[in-house]
């Protein structure tokens, strides 16, 4: 428990350092290196899938073993040394401060009426085209990103830490990074990235639904509409193209009385994603801040729940 709380506090105070030695940056470099080595456009679909699966296995093994080795050697440190090493590594696997900082920055620009710069900033955190987005569309994109990334950027790493300590949290982050880099359904990655995408879907199965429940409790604690959040999650979560992505987004949409989803543009091509929630309010800057509050509340609730469950089970905490 000390490790998880310390990791959260390290992130809250320091945030993610912008360094080429950041573990997730190193994972990205390894993935890019292996992609260059394994991907061949002329390969058959079956071979592309096999080579992509090999990339996944290698990245997972290296990431897990590196974290396990660091934790093994940290046990020789005096006092709280091992817990602090674990907390530092775990803090690199979660990103509440980065999400909050990005959201607050976009919110501030919208309040100033600076749509041009807000479009630029939101373009850093979403994959869609942003050059023609309205204020409501910028706010929608930001809320969707914060909600979805609460799963893979906070709750899921902490969930896998609870199960298997720091090495398993690192393994999850490696899997999620592979999905974000090669898990696309386009011509290049449809087969090569399929193993990465399927693995990410499987790993997020429980954390995504857990995040939805945490958001409902958070909505109740913060005075938002928890009942509507539950109803919208049950009604709309399965409409998301991802098997997991809809739970956090639908719950936030219900709690804040907004509608997410709709028309997005990718590389100049419009794509419609099913609506989630009801447009009781027009999505705006205040909903970004409310979503950030829900994100932090859900994180604290998870840490409290983590403590209670492990105490009841009689296990020592990581």
PLM features per residue range, with description:
Residues 1-171, 175, 183-318:
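Hydrophobic alpha-helical transmembrane segments
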């Amino acid at each position: 428990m000390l490790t998880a709380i310390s990791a959260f506090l390290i992130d809250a105070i320091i945030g993610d350092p912008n360094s080429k030695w950041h573990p997730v940056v190193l994972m990205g470099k390894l993935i890019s290196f292996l992609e260059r080595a394994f991907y061949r456009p002329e390969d058959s679909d079956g071979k592309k899938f096999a080579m992509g699966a090999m990339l996944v296995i290698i990245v997972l093994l290296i990431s897990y073993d590196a974290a396990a080795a660091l934790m093994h050697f940290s046990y020789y440190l005096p006092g709280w040394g091992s817990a602090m090493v674990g907390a530092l590594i775990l803090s690199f696997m979660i990103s509440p401060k980065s999400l909050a900082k990005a959201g607050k920055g976009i919110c501030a620009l919208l309040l100033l009426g600076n749509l041009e710069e807000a479009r630029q900033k939101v373009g850093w955190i979403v994959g869609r085209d942003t050059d023609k987005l309205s204020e409501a569309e910028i706010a929608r994109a930001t809320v969707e990103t914060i909600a979805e990334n609460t799963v893979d950027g906070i709750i899921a790493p902490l969930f896998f830490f609870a199960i298997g300590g720091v090495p398993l949290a690192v393994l999850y982050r490696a899997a999620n990074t592979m999905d974000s880099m090669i898990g696309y359904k386009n011509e290049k990655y449809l087969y090569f990235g399929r193993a990465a995408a399927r693995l990410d879907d499987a790993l997020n199965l429980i954390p995504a639904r857990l995040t939805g429940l945490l958001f409902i409790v958070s909505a109740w604690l913060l005075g938002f509409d928890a009942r509507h959040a539950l109803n919208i999650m049950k009604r709309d979560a399965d409409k998301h193209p991802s098997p997991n992505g809809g739970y956090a987004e639908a719950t936030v949409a219900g709690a804040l009385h907004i509608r997410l989803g709709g028309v997005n543009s990718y590389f100049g091509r419009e794509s419609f994603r099913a609506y989630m929630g009801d447009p009781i309010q027009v999505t705006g800057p205040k909903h970004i801040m409310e979503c950030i509050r829900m994100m932090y509340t859900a994180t604290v609730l998870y840490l409290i729940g983590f403590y209670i469950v492990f105490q009841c089970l009689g296990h020592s905490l990581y």
